[in-house]
Amino acid sequence: LPAVADICAVPGLAGIYVGPADLAISMGLGLAEMTTAPAMIDAIDSIQGAAAAAGLVAGIHAGDGRTGKAMAQRGFRMITLASESQALRRGAQDHLRDAGGDGSQDAKGYN
C-alpha cells in the first residue's frame, strides 16, 4: 500500500484492479472482513484515490450486487460482480426455479 501511487504512475497503465481477498490476506485480515473492516475500507479508498489521481480506471472484485453498488459509490469504475462459478450456480438455480423446482435440490436425472 505505501507504493500505490508509484504503481499507478507506471507508464502505459490504463487501470488497476483490486482483489479484496488477496488484499485482506496480505493485511492479516480474514476473508469475512474483506469489505467491512475499517482498515480494508481505508486501503480500498487509498487505492481508488491513487488510481483516480493518476487518471487510471480503478477496478475491483465485488462478489455480489450490493458490494458492487457500494464500490461504485466509492468511485470504482470497473466492477466484477461474481466469479464464473457463482454466476453459473445462480443461473442454474434460476433455471430450476423457473422449471418448477426451488433450485436447492440436486438433479435426479431420468427415472
Model-derived features: where do they sit?
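Expand to "…catalyze enediolate/carbanion chemistry for C-C bond making/breaking, isomerization
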Residues: 1-111
